[in-house]
Amino acid sequence: MSEYELPPLPYDYDALEPHISEQVLTWHHDTHHQGYVNGWNDAEETLAENRETGDHASTAGALGDVTHNGSGHILHTLFWQSMSPAGGDEPSGALADRIAADFGSYENWRAEFEAAASAASGWALLVYDSHSNTLRNVAVDNHDEGALWGSHPILALDVWEHSYYYDYGPDRGSFVDAFFEVVDWDEPTERFEQAAERFE
C-alpha cells in the first residue's frame, strides 16, 4: 500500500503576508495538514490489517477516519493551490463565463460564496456539479459533511478556526476578504476545464 505524503506549499511560508501570516501558514500546513495525511495513512493501515486478520472490531472507526482525514488532505491541497502571492484578480476566460452564466454575475457568485463561508464550520467550496453540469457553492462542515455527490471541487476556502484565529481573532469576514486578496484562479480554471471536458 502506498502512503500519502504532505505536498510542499507552492510558495514560501511568508509569501501571502500580510493577508495570511507566515506563522499561520506554518502551523496550518506543517501541523494540521500533516495530521490529516498521518491520519489517513494510519486508517488505511488499520483497514489493511483488519482485512488480513479478519478482525473488524476497529473497521467502522477506521472507515470514518479515511473519510475525515482523506477529505481533509484533499481539500487542504486544493486550498493551497487556490492562492498565490500573485493572486487577487477575478477569474477570466471560460470559468468567468460559466460563473456569469450560472450565478448571474461574478458579484453574485462571490456574495453567495461568502455566505457559504460564513455559515460553514469547515469549508466554502466552488464545485462543478456533474449531474447538472453547473457550478455551485457548497458549505461543508468538518471536511466531509454537506458535500454533494458527483461534484468536483474547483476552489476551496478553509474556514476552520485554525485558518484565521491567530491573524484575525473571531473576525472570519476579514479573513474571507483577505483570501480574495490572494486568490489565484489558474488552478481552479484548469480544474473547471477538466471537469467540463469530461462531463459535457
Swiss-Prot record:
Which residues of the sequence carry a binding annotation for Mn(2+)?
29, 76, 158, 162
Question: How does the cofactor attach, per the note?
Answer: Binds 1 Mn(2+) ion per subunit.
Q: What class of enzyme is it?
A: oxidoreductase
Calcium recorded as keyword = no
Q: Could you state one GO cellular component term attached to this entry?
A: cytoplasm
Instruction: Give GO MF terms, alphabetically.
Output: metal ion binding; superoxide dismutase activity
Q: What is its EC number?
A: 1.15.1.1
What Pfam families has UniProt attached to this entry?
Sod_Fe_C, Sod_Fe_N
Q: How is its activity regulated?
A: Inhibited by hydrogen peroxide. Is resistant to cyanide and azide inhibition.
Tell me yes or no: is Cytoplasm among this UniProt entry's keywords. no
Q: How does it assemble?
A: Homodimer or homotetramer.
Query: What is this protein's record name?
Result: Superoxide dismutase [Mn] 1
Quote the gene name from the UniProt entry.
sod1
